[in-house]
Protein backbone atom coordinates (compact mmCIF):
# COMPACT_ATOMS: atom_id res chain seq x y z
CA UNK A 1 0.00 0.00 0.00
CA UNK A 2 1.27 3.47 -0.89
CA UNK A 3 1.96 5.57 2.20
CA UNK A 4 0.41 8.66 0.63
CA UNK A 5 -2.73 9.94 2.32
CA UNK A 6 -5.95 8.24 1.23
CA UNK A 7 -9.40 9.75 0.97
CA UNK A 8 -12.54 7.61 1.33
CA UNK A 9 -15.78 8.61 -0.34
CA UNK A 10 -18.75 8.77 2.03
CA UNK A 11 -21.65 8.21 -0.35
CA UNK A 12 -22.66 4.80 1.05
CA UNK A 13 -22.72 3.53 4.64
CA UNK A 14 -21.43 -0.02 4.20
CA UNK A 15 -19.04 0.15 1.25
CA UNK A 16 -17.19 2.63 -0.89
CA UNK A 17 -14.09 3.59 -2.79
CA UNK A 18 -10.88 5.32 -1.85
CA UNK A 19 -8.33 7.43 -3.70
CA UNK A 20 -4.67 8.10 -3.01
CA UNK A 21 -4.06 11.83 -2.77
CA UNK A 22 -0.93 12.71 -4.73
CA UNK A 23 -1.33 16.41 -4.00
CA UNK A 24 -4.05 18.41 -2.26
CA UNK A 25 -4.95 21.44 -4.39
CA UNK A 26 -7.93 22.96 -2.59
CA UNK A 27 -10.00 22.26 0.51
CA UNK A 28 -12.51 24.84 1.73
CA UNK A 29 -16.19 25.40 2.41
CA UNK A 30 -18.20 27.63 0.09
CA UNK A 31 -21.56 29.13 1.14
CA UNK A 32 -23.24 26.00 -0.28
CA UNK A 33 -20.73 23.14 -0.31
CA UNK A 34 -17.65 21.60 1.24
CA UNK A 35 -15.23 21.35 -1.69
CA UNK A 36 -12.00 19.42 -2.08
CA UNK A 37 -9.79 19.14 -5.17
CA UNK A 38 -6.76 16.87 -5.34
CA UNK A 39 -4.52 15.03 -7.79
CA UNK A 40 -4.64 11.26 -8.22
CA UNK A 41 -2.28 9.22 -10.42
CA UNK A 42 -5.14 7.33 -12.12
CA UNK A 43 -7.92 9.91 -12.52
CA UNK A 44 -5.89 13.13 -12.61
CA UNK A 45 -7.54 16.01 -10.80
CA UNK A 46 -10.63 15.03 -8.80
CA UNK A 47 -13.30 17.35 -7.42
CA UNK A 48 -15.18 16.24 -4.31
CA UNK A 49 -18.31 18.06 -3.13
CA UNK A 50 -19.79 17.25 0.28
CA UNK A 51 -17.66 14.07 0.55
CA UNK A 52 -18.85 12.72 -2.83
CA UNK A 53 -16.78 12.55 -6.03
CA UNK A 54 -18.31 14.84 -8.63
CA UNK A 55 -15.91 14.83 -11.57
CA UNK A 56 -12.43 13.81 -12.64
CA UNK A 57 -10.15 14.77 -15.50
CA UNK A 58 -9.80 11.20 -16.73
CA UNK A 59 -13.37 10.10 -17.43
CA UNK A 60 -15.56 13.23 -17.35
CA UNK A 61 -16.13 12.95 -21.10
CA UNK A 62 -18.34 9.87 -20.69
CA UNK A 63 -20.81 11.52 -18.36
CA UNK A 64 -20.91 14.85 -20.18
CA UNK A 65 -21.23 13.36 -23.66
CA UNK A 66 -24.07 11.04 -22.70
CA UNK A 67 -26.08 13.62 -20.80
CA UNK A 68 -25.75 16.07 -23.71
CA UNK A 69 -25.60 14.32 -27.07
CA UNK A 70 -28.25 11.65 -26.57
CA UNK A 71 -31.12 14.18 -26.27
CA UNK A 72 -29.69 16.65 -28.80
CA UNK A 73 -29.20 14.05 -31.52
CA UNK A 74 -32.51 12.31 -30.72
CA UNK A 75 -34.41 15.59 -31.09
CA UNK A 76 -32.60 16.74 -34.21
CA UNK A 77 -33.40 20.46 -34.13
CA UNK A 78 -32.60 21.84 -30.68
CA UNK A 79 -32.49 25.65 -30.60
CA UNK A 80 -32.68 26.48 -26.90
CA UNK A 81 -31.11 24.67 -23.94
CA UNK A 82 -31.41 25.12 -20.19
CA UNK A 83 -28.63 23.62 -18.06
CA UNK A 84 -29.43 23.39 -14.35
CA UNK A 85 -26.31 22.84 -12.27
CA UNK A 86 -23.24 21.79 -14.19
CA UNK A 87 -20.88 24.28 -12.60
CA UNK A 88 -17.84 22.31 -13.75
CA UNK A 89 -18.64 23.44 -17.30
CA UNK A 90 -18.56 20.03 -18.99
CA UNK A 91 -22.19 20.01 -20.14
CA UNK A 92 -21.87 23.61 -21.29
CA UNK A 93 -18.78 22.71 -23.31
CA UNK A 94 -20.61 19.92 -25.13
CA UNK A 95 -23.75 22.00 -25.77
CA UNK A 96 -21.69 24.87 -27.18
CA UNK A 97 -20.25 22.59 -29.86
CA UNK A 98 -23.56 22.71 -31.75
CA UNK A 99 -23.86 25.67 -34.09
CA UNK A 100 -27.61 25.08 -34.54
CA UNK A 101 -28.25 25.96 -30.88
CA UNK A 102 -29.17 29.63 -30.57
CA UNK A 103 -29.71 30.21 -26.85
CA UNK A 104 -28.11 28.58 -23.81
CA UNK A 105 -29.22 29.36 -20.27
CA UNK A 106 -27.25 27.93 -17.37
CA UNK A 107 -28.37 28.13 -13.74
CA UNK A 108 -25.80 27.26 -11.06
CA UNK A 109 -26.36 27.87 -7.36
CA UNK A 110 -22.69 28.21 -6.41
CA UNK A 111 -20.51 30.64 -8.37
CA UNK A 112 -17.52 29.33 -6.42
CA UNK A 113 -17.81 25.97 -8.19
CA UNK A 114 -17.65 27.72 -11.55
CA UNK A 115 -14.59 29.74 -10.54
CA UNK A 116 -12.80 26.74 -9.05
CA UNK A 117 -13.39 24.62 -12.13
CA UNK A 118 -12.19 27.37 -14.43
CA UNK A 119 -8.96 27.36 -12.42
CA UNK A 120 -8.40 23.66 -11.74
CA UNK A 121 -10.39 22.00 -14.56
CA UNK A 122 -10.04 24.41 -17.51
CA UNK A 123 -10.58 21.65 -20.08
CA UNK A 124 -14.01 20.89 -18.66
CA UNK A 125 -15.45 24.17 -19.94
CA UNK A 126 -12.80 24.79 -22.62
CA UNK A 127 -13.64 28.52 -22.82
CA UNK A 128 -17.39 27.78 -23.15
CA UNK A 129 -18.24 30.43 -20.55
CA UNK A 130 -17.17 33.01 -23.11
CA UNK A 131 -19.74 31.83 -25.68
CA UNK A 132 -22.00 34.74 -26.69
CA UNK A 133 -25.08 32.48 -26.66
CA UNK A 134 -24.75 31.85 -22.92
CA UNK A 135 -26.92 33.48 -20.27
CA UNK A 136 -25.35 32.48 -16.93
CA UNK A 137 -27.57 32.85 -13.86
CA UNK A 138 -26.45 32.26 -10.27
CA UNK A 139 -29.52 30.90 -8.51
CA UNK A 140 -31.16 27.79 -7.13
CA UNK A 141 -32.44 25.68 -10.01
CA UNK A 142 -35.90 25.14 -8.52
CA UNK A 143 -36.32 28.84 -7.80
CA UNK A 144 -35.40 29.69 -11.38
CA UNK A 145 -37.62 27.14 -13.09
CA UNK A 146 -40.62 28.20 -10.97
CA UNK A 147 -40.42 31.85 -11.97
CA UNK A 148 -38.98 31.93 -15.49
CA UNK A 149 -41.27 32.74 -18.41
CA UNK A 150 -39.03 31.05 -20.98
CA UNK A 151 -39.51 27.69 -22.65
CA UNK A 152 -36.74 25.41 -23.88
CA UNK A 153 -36.26 22.59 -26.35
CA UNK A 154 -34.00 20.77 -23.92
CA UNK A 155 -33.53 20.91 -20.15
CA UNK A 156 -30.47 19.16 -18.70
CA UNK A 157 -30.34 18.72 -14.93
CA UNK A 158 -26.69 18.16 -14.01
CA UNK A 159 -27.03 18.14 -10.25
CA UNK A 160 -25.17 16.77 -7.28
CA UNK A 161 -26.69 13.79 -5.47
CA UNK A 162 -30.01 14.38 -3.64
CA UNK A 163 -28.48 15.74 -0.45
CA UNK A 164 -28.23 19.34 0.74
CA UNK A 165 -29.23 21.90 -1.87
CA UNK A 166 -29.23 19.13 -4.50
CA UNK A 167 -32.46 17.73 -3.02
CA UNK A 168 -34.51 20.41 -4.77
CA UNK A 169 -33.59 18.98 -8.17
CA UNK A 170 -35.09 15.56 -7.41
CA UNK A 171 -38.50 16.70 -6.18
CA UNK A 172 -41.78 16.23 -8.01
CA UNK A 173 -42.25 20.00 -7.97
CA UNK A 174 -39.02 20.43 -9.92
CA UNK A 175 -40.03 17.91 -12.61
CA UNK A 176 -43.47 19.51 -12.88
CA UNK A 177 -41.97 22.93 -13.50
CA UNK A 178 -39.43 21.57 -15.96
CA UNK A 179 -42.24 19.97 -17.96
CA UNK A 180 -44.13 23.27 -18.03
CA UNK A 181 -41.08 25.08 -19.38
CA UNK A 182 -40.37 22.70 -22.23
CA UNK A 183 -41.49 23.39 -25.75
CA UNK A 184 -44.17 21.01 -27.04
CA UNK A 185 -41.67 18.42 -28.26
CA UNK A 186 -38.97 19.20 -25.71
CA UNK A 187 -36.83 16.73 -23.79
CA UNK A 188 -35.82 16.64 -20.13
CA UNK A 189 -32.77 14.63 -18.99
CA UNK A 190 -31.05 14.31 -15.62
CA UNK A 191 -28.33 12.32 -13.91
CA UNK A 192 -29.79 9.70 -11.62
CA UNK A 193 -26.85 7.94 -10.06
CA UNK A 194 -25.81 4.28 -10.06
CA UNK A 195 -28.94 2.14 -9.99
CA UNK A 196 -27.46 -0.89 -8.21
CA UNK A 197 -26.64 1.23 -5.15
CA UNK A 198 -29.14 4.09 -5.56
CA UNK A 199 -32.24 2.16 -6.56
CA UNK A 200 -34.64 4.08 -4.35
CA UNK A 201 -33.64 7.44 -5.83
CA UNK A 202 -34.15 6.15 -9.37
CA UNK A 203 -37.53 4.59 -8.60
CA UNK A 204 -38.71 7.82 -6.96
CA UNK A 205 -37.61 9.78 -10.02
CA UNK A 206 -39.45 7.32 -12.27
CA UNK A 207 -42.68 7.65 -10.29
CA UNK A 208 -42.49 11.44 -10.32
CA UNK A 209 -41.57 11.82 -13.99
CA UNK A 210 -44.41 9.50 -15.07
CA UNK A 211 -46.86 12.06 -13.74
CA UNK A 212 -45.75 14.63 -16.29
CA UNK A 213 -44.32 12.89 -19.39
CA UNK A 214 -45.82 10.36 -21.80
CA UNK A 215 -42.40 8.83 -22.41
CA UNK A 216 -40.48 8.33 -19.16
CA UNK A 217 -37.40 6.15 -19.46
CA UNK A 218 -33.79 5.82 -18.38
CA UNK A 219 -30.67 5.30 -20.43
CA UNK A 220 -27.27 4.17 -19.24
CA UNK A 221 -23.50 4.58 -19.40
CA UNK A 222 -20.51 3.12 -17.60
CA UNK A 223 -18.57 5.85 -15.82
CA UNK A 224 -15.61 4.45 -13.82
CA UNK A 225 -15.64 7.29 -11.30
CA UNK A 226 -19.18 6.51 -10.16
CA UNK A 227 -18.72 3.29 -8.23
CA UNK A 228 -21.22 0.44 -8.27
CA UNK A 229 -22.24 -0.44 -11.83
CA UNK A 230 -24.08 1.28 -14.64
CA UNK A 231 -25.09 4.90 -14.21
CA UNK A 232 -28.59 5.85 -15.34
CA UNK A 233 -29.91 9.08 -16.79
CA UNK A 234 -33.57 10.07 -16.55
CA UNK A 235 -35.40 10.82 -19.80
CA UNK A 236 -38.75 12.59 -20.07
CA UNK A 237 -40.62 13.82 -23.14
CA UNK A 238 -44.10 13.85 -24.65
CA UNK A 239 -42.79 12.82 -28.07
CA UNK A 240 -42.53 9.03 -28.16
CA UNK A 241 -40.92 9.08 -31.62
CA UNK A 242 -37.47 10.17 -30.42
CA UNK A 243 -36.58 6.74 -29.07
CA UNK A 244 -37.79 5.14 -32.31
CA UNK A 245 -35.07 6.80 -34.38
CA UNK A 246 -33.28 4.19 -36.45
CA UNK A 247 -29.56 3.55 -36.24
CA UNK A 248 -29.20 4.94 -39.75
CA UNK A 249 -30.98 8.19 -38.83
CA UNK A 250 -28.79 8.66 -35.75
CA UNK A 251 -25.67 7.96 -37.81
CA UNK A 252 -26.68 10.58 -40.38
CA UNK A 253 -27.41 13.19 -37.73
CA UNK A 254 -24.08 12.58 -36.04
CA UNK A 255 -22.26 12.79 -39.37
CA UNK A 256 -23.99 16.08 -40.17
CA UNK A 257 -22.75 17.64 -36.94
CA UNK A 258 -19.14 17.11 -38.07
CA UNK A 259 -18.28 16.57 -34.39
CA UNK A 260 -15.95 13.98 -32.91
CA UNK A 261 -16.73 12.17 -29.67
CA UNK A 262 -14.71 10.08 -27.23
CA UNK A 263 -17.52 7.85 -25.93
CA UNK A 264 -20.78 8.64 -27.71
CA UNK A 265 -21.63 7.15 -31.11
CA UNK A 266 -24.74 5.95 -32.93
CA UNK A 267 -24.67 2.40 -31.58
CA UNK A 268 -24.05 3.63 -28.04
CA UNK A 269 -27.03 5.99 -28.51
CA UNK A 270 -29.41 3.19 -29.51
CA UNK A 271 -28.11 0.60 -27.06
CA UNK A 272 -28.08 2.95 -24.06
CA UNK A 273 -31.88 2.67 -23.78
CA UNK A 274 -31.68 -1.14 -23.46
CA UNK A 275 -31.39 -1.56 -19.71
CA UNK A 276 -30.31 -4.66 -17.74
CA UNK A 277 -33.20 -6.86 -16.69
CA UNK A 278 -32.72 -6.23 -12.96
CA UNK A 279 -33.36 -2.52 -13.57
CA UNK A 280 -36.40 -3.20 -15.76
CA UNK A 281 -37.83 -5.53 -13.13
CA UNK A 282 -37.59 -2.89 -10.42
CA UNK A 283 -39.06 -0.16 -12.62
CA UNK A 284 -41.92 -2.36 -13.78
CA UNK A 285 -42.77 -3.27 -10.19
CA UNK A 286 -42.86 0.40 -9.22
Curated annotation (Swiss-Prot):
Catalytic activity: S-adenosyl 3-(methylsulfanyl)propylamine + putrescine = S-methyl-5'-thioadenosine + spermidine + H(+)
Keywords, ordered alphabetically: Cytoplasm, Polyamine biosynthesis, Spermidine biosynthesis, Transferase
Annotated compartments: Cytoplasm
Gene Ontology molecular function terms on file: spermidine synthase activity
Annotated positions binding S-methyl-5'-thioadenosine: 108, 140-141
PROSITE patterns with a match to the protein in the record: PABS_1, PABS_2
Enzyme class: transferase
Any one GO BP annotation for this protein: spermidine biosynthetic process
Residues bound to spermidine: 64, 88, 158-161
Main location, first listed in the record: cytoplasm
A Pfam family it matches: Spermine_synt_N
GO terms for cellular component: cytosol
Pathway this chain belongs to: Amine and polyamine biosynthesis; spermidine biosynthesis; spermidine from putrescine: step 1/1
Residues annotated as catalytic: 158 (proton acceptor)
UniProt keyword rRNA-binding, yes or no: no
Subunit structure: Homodimer or homotetramer.
HAMAP family in alphabetical order: Spermidine_synth
Family: Belongs to the spermidine/spermine synthase family.
Protein name: Polyamine aminopropyltransferase
Gene: speE
